[in-house]
Amino acid sequence: MKSTFLVVLELAFFLLPGRVLYAQKDSEDGGSHYSSDDCQVTPVIHVLQYPGCVPKPIPSFACIGRCASYIQVSGSKIWQMERSCMCCQESGEREASVSLFCPKAKNGEKKFRKVSTKAPLECMCRPCTGIEDANVIPQELTSFADEGTLTGYFQKSHYKSIE
């Protein structure tokens, strides 16, 4: 059971104007802990598909994690609410070209089709905005290391500046 002082202190913390970076949560054992941003590049398997070609799973990366978001009463206008919505997003890209086998290719057409794909280079918490749907969808998490298997597929592309 929380003391009245702690409840008042927590309430005052959330009503202060400005950005809340950490939110306190009660754990099952009765203690408290603070959650913070946890957004990182994570190895995944992407399945590349093209009509008439055999889908091909490849090792790739995705931005996975959580970022601090909140809504609170405005410090200057108590009848208004302040919102901060942060999302785990890419801050740079990797590019790769992969060949897909296309057994249904017509005579004169190539049996292999080169498909380009992208993956995040780095991830960070940024304001949530609409992001274009990617052509590839993470299918499952993998245990690939950052070196070795994955580095053969991807090369550094360009860096997107967020300002």
From Swiss-Prot:
First and last residue of the signal peptide: 1-23
Localisation: Secreted
UniProt entry keywords in alphabetical sequence: Disulfide bond, Hormone, Secreted, Signal
Disulfide links within the chain: 39-88, 53-102, 63-123, 67-125, 85-128
Keyword Oxidoreductase: no
Domain of life: Eukaryota
Note: The bursicon gene is encoded by two loci: burs124 on chromosome arm 2L contains exons 1, 2 and 4, and burs3 on arm 2R contains exon 3. Exon 3 is trans-spliced into position in the mature transcript. This unusual gene arrangement has existed for at least the 150 million years (MY) of mosquito evolution since the split of the culicid and anophelid family lineages, but is younger than the 250 MY split of the dipteran suborders Nematocera and Brachycera (containing the Culicidea and Drosophilidae, respectively).
Entry function: Final heterodimeric neurohormone released at the end of the molting cycle, involved in the sclerotization (tanning) of the insect cuticle, melanization and wing spreading.
Listed name of the protein: Bursicon
Source organism of this protein record: Anopheles gambiae (African malaria mosquito)
